[in-house]
Amino acid sequence: MKALSKLKAEEGIWMTDVPVPELGHNDLLIKIRKTAICGTDVHIYNWDEWSQKTIPVPMVVGHEYVGEVVGIGQEVKGFKIGDRVSGEGHITCGHCRNCRGGRTHLCRNTIGVGVNRPGCFAEYLVIPAFNAFKIPDNISDDLASIFDPFGNAVHTALSFDLVGEDVLVSGAGPIGIMAAAVAKHVGARNVVITDVNEYRLELARKMGVTRAVNVAKENLNDVMAELGMTEGFDVGLEMSGAPPAFRTMLDTMNHGGRIAMLGIPPSDMSIDWTKVIFKGLFIKGIYGREMFETWYKMAALIQSGLDLSPIITHRFSIDDFQKGFDAMRSGQSGKVILSWD
Protein backbone atom coordinates (compact mmCIF):
# COMPACT_ATOMS: atom_id res chain seq x y z
CA MET A 1 0.00 0.00 0.00
CA LYS A 2 1.02 3.64 -0.47
CA ALA A 3 2.27 5.42 2.64
CA LEU A 4 4.04 8.62 3.63
CA SER A 5 7.06 7.68 5.70
CA LYS A 6 10.06 9.16 7.41
CA LEU A 7 12.66 7.11 5.56
CA LYS A 8 15.84 9.06 6.29
CA ALA A 9 17.27 10.92 9.27
CA GLU A 10 17.05 14.25 7.44
CA GLU A 11 14.52 16.87 6.36
CA GLY A 12 11.62 15.49 4.33
CA ILE A 13 8.80 12.94 4.05
CA TRP A 14 8.70 10.32 1.32
CA MET A 15 6.02 8.33 -0.50
CA THR A 16 6.77 4.62 -0.31
CA ASP A 17 5.19 1.17 -0.46
CA VAL A 18 4.71 -0.76 2.78
CA PRO A 19 2.75 -3.91 3.66
CA VAL A 20 -0.88 -3.56 4.74
CA PRO A 21 -0.77 -3.73 8.57
CA GLU A 22 -1.75 -6.99 10.21
CA LEU A 23 -5.12 -7.12 12.00
CA GLY A 24 -5.00 -8.28 15.63
CA HIS A 25 -7.82 -9.88 17.62
CA ASN A 26 -8.82 -6.58 19.26
CA ASP A 27 -8.14 -4.30 16.29
CA LEU A 28 -9.91 -2.55 13.44
CA LEU A 29 -8.52 -2.27 9.92
CA ILE A 30 -9.44 1.17 8.59
CA LYS A 31 -9.33 2.25 4.94
CA ILE A 32 -8.21 5.87 5.09
CA ARG A 33 -10.32 8.49 3.31
CA LYS A 34 -8.79 11.77 4.46
CA THR A 35 -5.91 12.82 6.67
CA ALA A 36 -4.81 16.18 8.06
CA ILE A 37 -1.29 17.45 8.61
CA CYS A 38 -0.45 18.23 12.24
CA GLY A 39 2.24 20.48 13.62
CA THR A 40 3.83 17.29 14.94
CA ASP A 41 4.10 16.01 11.36
CA VAL A 42 5.86 19.26 10.43
CA HIS A 43 8.34 18.73 13.29
CA ILE A 44 8.99 15.24 11.93
CA TYR A 45 9.36 16.60 8.39
CA ASN A 46 11.85 19.23 9.61
CA TRP A 47 13.72 16.58 11.62
CA ASP A 48 14.17 18.88 14.59
CA GLU A 49 15.75 17.98 17.92
CA TRP A 50 12.54 16.45 19.32
CA SER A 51 12.04 14.29 16.22
CA GLN A 52 15.62 13.05 16.25
CA LYS A 53 15.17 11.88 19.85
CA THR A 54 11.68 10.42 19.36
CA ILE A 55 10.99 9.04 15.87
CA PRO A 56 12.41 5.66 14.81
CA VAL A 57 13.35 5.55 11.12
CA PRO A 58 11.64 4.28 9.00
CA MET A 59 8.20 5.24 10.32
CA VAL A 60 4.82 5.76 8.64
CA VAL A 61 3.68 9.09 10.08
CA GLY A 62 0.35 10.86 10.63
CA HIS A 63 -2.36 10.64 13.28
CA GLU A 64 -5.26 12.85 12.08
CA TYR A 65 -7.71 10.94 9.89
CA VAL A 66 -11.12 9.65 8.98
CA GLY A 67 -11.76 6.33 7.30
CA GLU A 68 -13.99 3.32 6.89
CA VAL A 69 -13.84 0.05 8.82
CA VAL A 70 -12.94 -2.77 6.39
CA GLY A 71 -11.68 -5.39 8.84
CA ILE A 72 -12.67 -6.39 12.39
CA GLY A 73 -10.66 -8.46 14.86
CA GLN A 74 -12.39 -11.57 16.17
CA GLU A 75 -12.69 -10.22 19.74
CA VAL A 76 -14.14 -6.83 18.70
CA LYS A 77 -17.72 -5.87 19.47
CA GLY A 78 -19.68 -2.71 18.66
CA PHE A 79 -18.35 -2.06 15.15
CA LYS A 80 -19.37 -3.28 11.71
CA ILE A 81 -17.86 -3.20 8.24
CA GLY A 82 -18.54 0.19 6.67
CA ASP A 83 -18.57 2.21 9.90
CA ARG A 84 -17.03 5.65 9.41
CA VAL A 85 -14.48 6.31 12.15
CA SER A 86 -11.73 8.54 13.38
CA GLY A 87 -9.66 7.54 16.37
CA GLU A 88 -7.69 8.46 19.44
CA GLY A 89 -4.00 8.66 18.53
CA HIS A 90 -2.76 7.84 22.03
CA ILE A 91 -2.59 4.08 22.56
CA THR A 92 -2.73 3.42 26.29
CA CYS A 93 -1.63 0.41 28.32
CA GLY A 94 -4.85 -0.38 30.20
CA HIS A 95 -3.08 -1.64 33.32
CA CYS A 96 -1.43 1.38 35.02
CA ARG A 97 -3.14 3.12 37.93
CA ASN A 98 -4.51 5.96 35.78
CA CYS A 99 -5.89 3.62 33.12
CA ARG A 100 -7.54 1.41 35.72
CA GLY A 101 -8.84 4.50 37.56
CA GLY A 102 -10.60 5.88 34.47
CA ARG A 103 -8.00 8.58 33.77
CA THR A 104 -6.84 6.95 30.56
CA HIS A 105 -5.49 10.17 29.02
CA LEU A 106 -2.90 10.27 31.82
CA CYS A 107 -1.46 6.82 31.03
CA ARG A 108 2.27 6.89 31.72
CA ASN A 109 2.88 4.24 29.03
CA THR A 110 1.19 6.04 26.11
CA ILE A 111 2.29 5.11 22.58
CA GLY A 112 1.63 7.61 19.79
CA VAL A 113 0.15 6.65 16.42
CA GLY A 114 2.49 7.96 13.73
CA VAL A 115 5.15 8.63 16.35
CA ASN A 116 6.01 5.34 18.09
CA ARG A 117 3.93 3.02 15.89
CA PRO A 118 2.82 3.19 12.22
CA GLY A 119 0.48 6.08 11.49
CA CYS A 120 -2.43 7.01 9.26
CA PHE A 121 -0.64 8.58 6.28
CA ALA A 122 -1.30 5.35 4.41
CA GLU A 123 -4.06 3.59 2.54
CA TYR A 124 -4.81 1.45 5.61
CA LEU A 125 -4.38 1.81 9.38
CA VAL A 126 -4.74 -0.71 12.20
CA ILE A 127 -5.62 0.55 15.68
CA PRO A 128 -7.19 -1.06 18.76
CA ALA A 129 -10.99 -0.94 18.50
CA PHE A 130 -10.95 0.75 21.93
CA ASN A 131 -9.39 3.80 20.25
CA ALA A 132 -11.88 4.13 17.39
CA PHE A 133 -14.70 6.68 17.47
CA LYS A 134 -17.76 6.39 15.23
CA ILE A 135 -18.48 9.57 13.29
CA PRO A 136 -22.14 10.70 13.23
CA ASP A 137 -23.69 10.93 9.76
CA ASN A 138 -24.16 14.70 9.99
CA ILE A 139 -20.43 15.40 10.45
CA SER A 140 -18.39 15.65 7.23
CA ASP A 141 -15.22 13.73 6.41
CA ASP A 142 -13.25 16.98 6.40
CA LEU A 143 -14.30 17.84 9.95
CA ALA A 144 -13.87 14.26 11.16
CA SER A 145 -10.30 14.23 9.84
CA ILE A 146 -9.36 17.07 12.22
CA PHE A 147 -11.00 15.62 15.33
CA ASP A 148 -7.60 14.88 16.89
CA PRO A 149 -6.44 18.54 17.02
CA PHE A 150 -10.00 19.74 17.63
CA GLY A 151 -9.90 17.46 20.67
CA ASN A 152 -6.81 19.24 21.96
CA ALA A 153 -8.72 22.51 21.63
CA VAL A 154 -11.84 21.15 23.34
CA HIS A 155 -9.88 19.55 26.19
CA THR A 156 -8.01 22.82 26.79
CA ALA A 157 -10.99 25.16 26.48
CA LEU A 158 -13.38 23.07 28.57
CA SER A 159 -10.93 22.61 31.43
CA PHE A 160 -12.77 25.40 33.25
CA ASP A 161 -16.25 26.92 33.37
CA LEU A 162 -16.28 29.58 30.65
CA VAL A 163 -19.84 30.91 30.88
CA GLY A 164 -19.71 34.70 31.23
CA GLU A 165 -15.92 34.71 31.59
CA ASP A 166 -13.26 36.78 29.83
CA VAL A 167 -10.84 34.43 28.07
CA LEU A 168 -7.34 35.07 26.72
CA VAL A 169 -5.98 32.63 24.12
CA SER A 170 -2.28 33.04 23.36
CA GLY A 171 -1.29 31.52 20.02
CA ALA A 172 -3.46 31.59 16.88
CA GLY A 173 -2.42 28.30 15.40
CA PRO A 174 -5.27 26.02 14.30
CA ILE A 175 -5.69 24.54 17.79
CA GLY A 176 -5.66 27.96 19.45
CA ILE A 177 -8.24 29.28 16.99
CA MET A 178 -10.49 26.26 17.53
CA ALA A 179 -10.16 26.65 21.32
CA ALA A 180 -11.20 30.29 21.01
CA ALA A 181 -14.19 29.29 18.88
CA VAL A 182 -15.23 26.70 21.48
CA ALA A 183 -14.96 29.28 24.27
CA LYS A 184 -17.18 31.71 22.39
CA HIS A 185 -19.66 28.96 21.45
CA VAL A 186 -20.17 27.80 25.05
CA GLY A 187 -20.82 31.26 26.46
CA ALA A 188 -17.63 33.15 27.27
CA ARG A 189 -18.14 36.92 27.31
CA ASN A 190 -14.96 38.23 25.67
CA VAL A 191 -12.58 35.89 23.83
CA VAL A 192 -9.32 37.59 22.90
CA ILE A 193 -6.65 35.75 20.89
CA THR A 194 -3.08 36.99 20.42
CA ASP A 195 -0.35 36.24 17.90
CA VAL A 196 2.04 38.00 15.50
CA ASN A 197 0.92 36.08 12.38
CA GLU A 198 -1.64 38.28 10.62
CA TYR A 199 -2.86 35.47 8.33
CA ARG A 200 -3.85 33.34 11.30
CA LEU A 201 -5.31 36.26 13.23
CA GLU A 202 -7.59 36.88 10.24
CA LEU A 203 -8.64 33.21 10.39
CA ALA A 204 -9.50 33.73 14.06
CA ARG A 205 -11.67 36.71 13.14
CA LYS A 206 -13.56 34.52 10.67
CA MET A 207 -14.17 32.06 13.52
CA GLY A 208 -15.93 34.73 15.57
CA VAL A 209 -13.51 35.76 18.33
CA THR A 210 -14.22 39.04 20.11
CA ARG A 211 -10.78 40.46 19.25
CA ALA A 212 -7.77 39.07 17.40
CA VAL A 213 -4.74 41.06 18.54
CA ASN A 214 -1.39 41.35 16.77
CA VAL A 215 0.77 42.01 19.82
CA ALA A 216 3.56 43.36 17.59
CA LYS A 217 1.24 46.25 16.70
CA GLU A 218 -1.31 46.55 19.53
CA ASN A 219 -1.07 46.74 23.30
CA LEU A 220 -3.18 44.10 25.04
CA ASN A 221 -3.96 46.42 27.95
CA ASP A 222 -5.46 48.92 25.49
CA VAL A 223 -7.66 46.15 24.05
CA MET A 224 -8.82 45.20 27.55
CA ALA A 225 -9.75 48.83 28.26
CA GLU A 226 -11.60 49.02 24.93
CA LEU A 227 -13.66 45.96 25.97
CA GLY A 228 -14.45 47.44 29.38
CA MET A 229 -12.36 44.89 31.24
CA THR A 230 -11.17 46.32 34.55
CA GLU A 231 -9.93 43.29 36.48
CA GLY A 232 -8.09 41.04 34.00
CA PHE A 233 -8.84 37.76 32.27
CA ASP A 234 -10.62 35.01 34.17
CA VAL A 235 -9.31 32.14 32.04
CA GLY A 236 -6.11 31.81 30.01
CA LEU A 237 -5.54 29.20 27.30
CA GLU A 238 -1.82 29.09 26.49
CA MET A 239 -1.39 27.48 23.06
CA SER A 240 1.82 29.06 21.76
CA GLY A 241 4.70 27.78 23.87
CA ALA A 242 6.19 31.28 23.49
CA PRO A 243 7.68 32.65 26.74
CA PRO A 244 6.73 36.31 26.02
CA ALA A 245 3.12 35.26 25.42
CA PHE A 246 2.95 33.34 28.70
CA ARG A 247 4.50 36.23 30.62
CA THR A 248 1.90 38.59 29.15
CA MET A 249 -0.81 36.15 30.15
CA LEU A 250 0.44 36.13 33.75
CA ASP A 251 0.49 39.95 33.72
CA THR A 252 -3.11 40.24 32.51
CA MET A 253 -4.81 37.45 34.50
CA ASN A 254 -7.25 38.40 37.23
CA HIS A 255 -6.54 37.25 40.77
CA GLY A 256 -7.78 33.68 41.12
CA GLY A 257 -7.54 33.16 37.36
CA ARG A 258 -7.19 29.73 35.79
CA ILE A 259 -4.75 28.81 33.03
CA ALA A 260 -4.71 25.71 30.82
CA MET A 261 -1.38 25.13 29.06
CA LEU A 262 -1.17 23.13 25.83
CA GLY A 263 1.73 24.98 24.21
CA ILE A 264 5.16 23.55 24.99
CA PRO A 265 7.63 26.25 26.09
CA PRO A 266 11.42 25.82 26.05
CA SER A 267 12.71 23.94 29.09
CA ASP A 268 14.63 26.98 30.33
CA MET A 269 11.66 29.40 30.26
CA SER A 270 11.73 31.77 33.21
CA ILE A 271 8.70 33.56 34.64
CA ASP A 272 7.99 35.78 37.63
CA TRP A 273 6.58 33.16 40.00
CA THR A 274 5.43 35.84 42.45
CA LYS A 275 2.63 36.62 39.97
CA VAL A 276 1.45 33.02 40.12
CA ILE A 277 1.64 32.94 43.90
CA PHE A 278 0.25 36.34 44.88
CA LYS A 279 -2.50 36.22 42.25
CA GLY A 280 -3.47 32.74 43.39
CA LEU A 281 -3.37 31.42 39.82
CA PHE A 282 -4.25 27.81 38.96
CA ILE A 283 -2.24 26.28 36.10
CA LYS A 284 -3.24 22.99 34.47
CA GLY A 285 -1.11 21.10 31.94
CA ILE A 286 -2.98 19.64 28.94
CA TYR A 287 -1.90 16.61 26.93
CA GLY A 288 -4.11 15.03 24.29
CA ARG A 289 -7.79 14.43 24.86
CA GLU A 290 -9.80 12.93 27.72
CA MET A 291 -10.82 9.44 26.66
CA PHE A 292 -13.44 9.57 25.52
CA GLU A 293 -15.44 12.38 27.05
CA THR A 294 -13.63 14.92 24.87
CA TRP A 295 -14.62 12.97 21.75
CA TYR A 296 -18.32 13.02 22.64
CA LYS A 297 -18.13 16.74 23.35
CA MET A 298 -16.44 17.36 19.98
CA ALA A 299 -19.27 15.72 18.10
CA ALA A 300 -21.90 17.49 20.22
CA LEU A 301 -20.30 20.91 19.73
CA ILE A 302 -20.41 20.53 15.95
CA GLN A 303 -23.95 19.15 16.05
CA SER A 304 -25.02 22.13 18.18
CA GLY A 305 -23.86 24.61 15.55
CA LEU A 306 -20.13 25.24 16.07
CA ASP A 307 -18.75 25.98 12.59
CA LEU A 308 -15.12 24.93 12.16
CA SER A 309 -15.11 25.09 8.37
CA PRO A 310 -13.03 28.32 8.09
CA ILE A 311 -10.08 26.61 9.81
CA ILE A 312 -9.66 24.21 6.85
CA THR A 313 -7.84 26.34 4.27
CA HIS A 314 -6.11 23.86 1.94
CA ARG A 315 -7.09 20.54 0.35
CA PHE A 316 -4.81 18.34 -1.77
CA SER A 317 -4.72 14.87 -3.27
CA ILE A 318 -2.27 12.59 -1.47
CA ASP A 319 -0.12 12.62 -4.62
CA ASP A 320 0.37 16.36 -3.99
CA PHE A 321 1.39 15.83 -0.36
CA GLN A 322 4.46 18.02 -0.82
CA LYS A 323 2.23 21.02 -1.56
CA GLY A 324 0.39 20.29 1.67
CA PHE A 325 3.56 20.23 3.74
CA ASP A 326 4.80 23.38 2.00
CA ALA A 327 1.56 25.15 2.95
CA MET A 328 1.84 24.04 6.59
CA ARG A 329 5.51 24.99 6.83
CA SER A 330 4.84 28.45 5.37
CA GLY A 331 2.74 29.51 8.37
CA GLN A 332 0.15 30.81 5.90
CA SER A 333 -2.45 28.10 6.40
CA GLY A 334 -5.02 26.71 8.75
CA LYS A 335 -5.60 22.97 8.62
CA VAL A 336 -4.41 21.15 5.49
CA ILE A 337 -6.39 18.08 4.33
CA LEU A 338 -4.96 15.26 2.18
CA SER A 339 -7.46 13.08 0.31
CA TRP A 340 -6.67 9.38 -0.19
CA ASP A 341 -9.71 8.60 -2.39
From Swiss-Prot:
Catalytic reactions on record: L-threonine + NAD(+) = (2S)-2-amino-3-oxobutanoate + NADH + H(+)
Cofactors that this protein relies on: Zn(2+)
Pathway: Amino-acid degradation; L-threonine degradation via oxydo-reductase pathway; glycine from L-threonine: step 1/2
Binding positions (Zn(2+) 1): C38, H63, E64
GO BP annotation list: L-threonine catabolic process to glycine
Domain of life: Bacteria
GO molecular function terms noted in the UniProt entry: L-threonine 3-dehydrogenase activity; zinc ion binding
Active site: T40 (charge relay system), H43 (charge relay system)
InterPro entries with a match to the protein in the record: ADH-like_C (IPR013149), ADH-like_N (IPR013154), ADH_Zn_CS (IPR002328), GroES-like_sf (IPR011032), L-Threonine_3-DHase (IPR004627), NAD(P)-bd_dom_sf (IPR036291), PKS_ER (IPR020843), Zn_alcohol_dh (IPR050129)
EC number, UniProt record: 1.1.1.103
PANTHER family in UniProt: L-THREONINE 3-DEHYDROGENASE
GO cellular component assignments: cytoplasm
Gene: tdh
Keyword Cytoplasm: yes
Main localization of the protein described in the UniProt heading: cytoplasm
Residues that bind Zn(2+) 2: C93, C96, C99, C107
Protein name: L-threonine 3-dehydrogenase
Annotated site, Important for catalytic activity for the proton relay mechanism but does not participate directly in the coordination of zinc atom, chain positions: D148
Purpose of the protein: Catalyzes the NAD(+)-dependent oxidation of L-threonine to 2-amino-3-ketobutyrate.
Record has Zinc as a keyword: yes
A Pfam family: ADH_zinc_N
Family according to the record: Belongs to the zinc-containing alcohol dehydrogenase family.
Native organism: Escherichia coli O17:K52:H18 (strain UMN026 / ExPEC)
Gene3D superfamilies the record matches: Medium-chain alcohol dehydrogenases, catalytic domain (3.90.180.10), NAD(P)-binding Rossmann-like Domain (3.40.50.720)
Subunit text: Homotetramer.
UniProt keyword list: Cytoplasm, Metal-binding, NAD, Oxidoreductase, Zinc
